[in-house]
């Protein structure tokens, strides 16, 4: 039988999808990308912000139509939306057969069996259980890079965020298990490991009594075949001197950090439940750039948080201008039910949020272009992603670019290159967020 898997949301969700795909493949199920030939459809959902929730619901409704028409034998919904609205999904969309919570992915085979037998049920596990069964993942990212989810859940409880309710408390995956998983990925041809979690920098504190991300990274550096290790979702206040030292000493560790700071006004930061002040953020950024001069820093911001004044928005704009982050994304605030921020007074109109978002991104575009122009003439190591269709050109990424969120470099060459190859490239031109180069 053929299964179509629709994976929505973040890279952490994608890891969950790959785990379930591995379990299904071990049973002999065949995967397909064509909904018209699928016997079973599984939708791994997201509900982090309003748009993600809407996308998940729309996908469920579209696939439910196929089930209603008799084209699909079973429809299963998993992920954050399933955990949060499990009963409502079954009540309001009767075409859905099974709903799996975020810690019940090891029961995907049971869910498929039950769905094919005509059962309709919710399958849950303890919200604070370690959700990922030890199984061989079916990597879906092309084979040359893969995400390594090092922890689940979050203890921060930011006032705008629903994640602790749908993912549980923070719990680290044991280091030995992660090293074994990374070794298996390397044996499959993976060359870049991208460490992800709701927060990576707190890794190990629950298991080992101290933050141990630096120890994990050193252990991963010893795996043959791994060329790059990239770290995402670092909380600024949790970055340790030991982690900085590992980044300086280990050549496999990309000089790249993703630091979601969300805002720069102290009042807004406090209302968000964040644990840093503006000055502390400045100090952390300056320290990282002093210790690792070629580091690439990515951040994300939220604009239009309840009570954000025009003056506080201008302060954020000034902060972005002064800090000159290499990479930056901006979300408009999305009120999520059952979060403290959703009930706060002075909610901002959507039009104002979007205008402020556009202003920040216009400023960041100028910063990004200036930084891209500064790269012209430099020689860089590039991981090849693939060939540009119908052209003698390839596209790749430098250490400064995480897949799917950052820029690319376009390389003109007649040589034959493969995805996952590394090549030395001279930068010859700059676009808004991307580079142009020639093979050396």
Task: List where the protein language model places each region.
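Conserved, mostly hydrophobic/aromatic
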Residues: 178, 195, 231, 259, ...
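Conserved SAM/AdoMet-binding glycine-rich loop
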Residues: 75-77, 84, 187-311, 321
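Proteins enriched for Cys/Gly/acidic motifs involved in redox and nucleic-acid/cofactor modification
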Residues: 1-203, 242, 253, 257, ...
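Terminal RNA-binding accessory module
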Residues: 343-440
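Short strand-connecting beta-turns/loops that link adjacent beta-strands
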Residues: 36-37, 155, 252, 264, ...
């Amino acid at each position: 039988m053929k299964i179509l898997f629709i994976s929505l949301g973040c890279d952490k969700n994608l890891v969950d999808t790959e785990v379930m795909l591995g379990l299904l493949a071990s049973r002999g199920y065949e995967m397909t990308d064509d909904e018209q030939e699928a016997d079973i459809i599984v939708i791994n959902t997201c509900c982090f912000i309003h748009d993600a929730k809407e996308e998940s619901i729309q996908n469920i409704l579209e696939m439910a139509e196929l089930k209603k028409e008799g084209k699909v034998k079973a429809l299963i919904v998993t992920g954050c939306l399933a955990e949060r609205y499990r009963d409502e999904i079954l009540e309001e969309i009767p075409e859905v057969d099974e709903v799996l919570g975020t810690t019940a992915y090891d029961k995907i085979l049971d869910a498929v069996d039950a769905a094919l037998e005509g059962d309709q049920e919710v399958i849950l596990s303890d919200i604070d259980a370690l959700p990922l069964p030890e199984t061989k993942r079916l990597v879906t990212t092309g084979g040359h890079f893969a995400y390594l989810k090092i922890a689940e859940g979050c203890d921060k409880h930011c006032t705008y965020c629903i994640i602790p309710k749908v993912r549980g408390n923070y719990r680290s995956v044991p280091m030995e298990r992660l090293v074994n998983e990374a070794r298996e990925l390397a044996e499959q041809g993976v060359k870049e490991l991208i460490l992800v979690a709701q927060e990576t920098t707190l890794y190990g504190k629950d298991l080992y009594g101290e933050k141990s991300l630096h120890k994990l990274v050193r252990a991963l550096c010893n795996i043959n075949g791994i060329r790059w290790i990239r770290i995402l979702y670092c909380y600024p206040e949790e970055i340790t001197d030991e982690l900085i030292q590992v980044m300086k000493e280990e050549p496999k560790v990309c000089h790249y950090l993703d630091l979601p700071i969300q805002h720069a006004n102290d009042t807004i930061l406090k209302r968000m439940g964040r644990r840093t002040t503006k000055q502390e953020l400045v100090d952390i950024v300056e320290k990282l750039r002093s210790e690792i001069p070629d580091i690439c820093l990515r951040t994300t911001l939220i604009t239009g948080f309840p009570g954000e004044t025009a003056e506080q928005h201008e302060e954020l704009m000034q902060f972005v201008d002064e800090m000159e982050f290499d990479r930056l994304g901006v979300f408009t605030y999305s009120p999520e039910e059952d979060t403290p921020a959703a009930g706060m007074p002075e909610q901002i109109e959507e039009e104002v949020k979007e205008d402020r978002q556009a202003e920040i991104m216009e400023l960041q575009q100028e910063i990004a272009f200036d930084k891209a122009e500064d790269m012209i003439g430099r020689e860089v190591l590039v991981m090849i992603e693939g060939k540009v269709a119908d052209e003698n050109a390839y596209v790749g990424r430098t250490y400064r670019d995480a897949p799917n969120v950052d820029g690319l470099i376009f390389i003109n060459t007649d040589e034959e290159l493969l995805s996952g190859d590394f090549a030395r490239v001279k930068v010859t031109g700059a676009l808004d967020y991307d580079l142009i180069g020639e093979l050396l």
